Curated annotation (Swiss-Prot):
Top EC class, one word: translocase
Record EC number: 7.3.2.2
Primary localization: membrane
The protein's name: Phosphonates import ATP-binding protein PhnC
Record-level Gene Ontology MF annotations: ABC-type phosphonate transporter activity; ATP binding; ATP hydrolysis activity
UniProt source species: Bordetella bronchiseptica (strain ATCC BAA-588 / NCTC 13252 / RB50)
């Protein structure tokens, strides 16, 4: 069953009367990479964090439907929320690795949602999970790095670990919050290629918040442009002409 995500009337206010997200409506269905672009402060990261319930939406619906069932992520609580979040992989801008742990240990944290508190505390993991972790390290180009500490890795290597950790969850939906913002151009391309490839291989939608319009054009089959907490564009890269980019970002100096 293909994964679908339906967002309806999503609002997020950090201060009353000043919404960061102002009535977002968005449907994501089937595999493929969707890029979210827009200026800083327009709510791109807030949107992804609402989907994964790292922050609480103020109002609206976030309905995830996949092989495990249908759940409104905006309303679910407690153990039901814990189970729902297992279905969503998240790749973070600043990697969000445990620096003192090895690469292998960081990957295995992606299975904590499936592991008892005692086994997690004792660092006891299923042999099948360990085997999968080694396979994923090979997939992301880090074979042989299992025993290296995370703080010994380059930025690109850390992001690859972050992607592998997200895939350890066997997610039905993969979110990536500015995954290339701290990387050089060559590594940024490699990370986008990896996200696109893994979305296709695993048959899941990938939703990427990205600041680089050209990378979005190159890899996304769908681009969502946000401005002022609203969706102002939803289409492919061909529709992102100078007029539309001005609508999304405001001004023209950045186009020169």
């Amino acid at each position: 069953m293909a994964t679908s995500l339906r967002i309806t009337g999503l609002v997020k206010e950090y201060r009353a009367g000043k919404p960061v997200l102002n009535g977002i409506d968005l449907d994501i269905a089937g595999q493929g990479l969707t890029a979210i672009i827009g200026p800083s402060g327009t709510g791109k990261s807030t949107l992804l964090r609402c989907i994964n319930r790292l922050i609480e939406p103020t109002s609206g619906e976030i309905v995830l439907k996949d092989a495990e069932g249908t759940v409104d992520l905006a309303r679910v609580r407690g153990q039901s929320l814990r189970r729902a979040r297992r279905r969503i992989g998240m790749v973070f801008q600043e990697y969000n690795l445990v620096e003192r742990l090895t690469v292998m240990e960081n990957l295995l944290t992606g299975r904590l949602g499936y592991t008892s508190a005692l086994n997690a505390w004792m660092r006891r993991f299923d042999p099948a999970d360990i085997e999968r972790a080694f396979q994923l390290l090979d997939t992301v180009g880090l074979a042989g790095f299992a025993d290296q500490r995370a703080d010994a890795l380059s930025g690109g290597q850390r992001q690859r670990v972050g992607i592998a950790r997200a895939l350890m969850q066997r997610p039905q939906l993969l979110l990536a919050d500015e995954p290339t913002s701290s990387l050089d151009p060559k590594t940024s391309v490699e990370i986008m290629e990896l996200l696109t490839e893994q979305g296709s291989v695993n048959g899941i939608p990938v939703l990427v918040n990205i600041h680089d319009v050209e990378l979005a054009r190159r890899y996304a089959n769908r681009i969502v442009g946000m401005s002022g907490g609203h969706v102002v564009y939803d289409g492919d890269g061909k529709g992102l002409d100078a007029t539309m980019l001005k609508t999304i970002y405001g001004g023209e100096s950045w186009l020169e």
